[in-house]
């Protein structure tokens, strides 16, 4: 599911919308946070 969420921006990046970059950043940050919490 995370992979699918990260693939969405690559499809929508053609629109060159700033929301796409913000969305990708949010997904990446959330995923990294999840990995950090999972380790503990």
From Swiss-Prot:
Keywords: Membrane, Transmembrane, Transmembrane helix
Upper classification of the organism: Archaea, Methanobacteriati, Methanobacteriota, Archaeoglobi, Archaeoglobales
GO CC list: membrane
Keyword match Transmembrane: yes
Name the UniProt record assigns to this protein: Uncharacterized protein AF_0236
Subcellular locations according to the entry: Membrane
Primary location group: membrane
Transmembrane segments: 20-37
Membrane-protein topology: Single-pass membrane protein
